[in-house]
Amino acid sequence: MNGGYEICAGEQMDDPVVADHFGKMWRHSPVPESALVDDWFDRTMAFIADARAAGTFLTYLARSHDEIIGSLAAQQFAGLYPDVIRHEYRRYAYVWGVFVCPAHRRQGIASALMRRSLDDMRPLGCSRVLLHASVMGSPVYEGLGFNATNELKLDLVA
């Protein structure tokens, strides 16, 4: 146990907590709650089930005593376009859900979750890890060696 918490791999029985944390992550973001679809939990659980069935899903939990105080979800990234590059050159992982309960933030928990996931991604042959960070989360990831890329965006909806 590190600083009153421990990091462990999540199991299928933990998926509802990971899905709940994913919803909380969005509710703690600048996205208005009204933007979330009503069935966000069911959609997240279905997404997780598909990723688990494909064998590409990793989850990690931060536990303090018997309470889950944080989680991370990641998976092999299939990409946004046809995969024509050999896997040894381009086998990406995508971290899509890092959440730490507000009362436990600023204690290194998100960094510990990330370090554990990175340790497990390397032996899987991942060549790069991608994520999208909130303003609050960016310093955490930059401290782990992540850097800004050439991704550009254009908001078409005001």
Describe every region a protein language model picked out:
Residues 79-82, 130-136, 142, 147-158:
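Conserved catalytic-core motifs of GNAT/GCN5-like acyltransferases
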Residues 104-116:
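Conserved acetyl-CoA pyrophosphate-binding loop and the N-cap/start of the following alpha-helix
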Residues 61, 67-76, 94, 99:
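Conserved beta-strand in the GNAT
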Residues 46-61, 94:
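A short helix-loop-beta-strand connector motif used in the catalytic cores of GNAT acetyltransferases and
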Residues 6-20:
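A short beta-loop-alpha structural element at the N-terminal edge
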Residues 86-102, 154:
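Conserved acetyl-CoA binding element of GNAT-fold acetyltransferases
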Residues 121-133:
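Conserved GNAT acetyl-CoA-binding A-motif
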Residues 26-47:
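Conserved GNAT-fold acetyl-CoA-binding loop/helix
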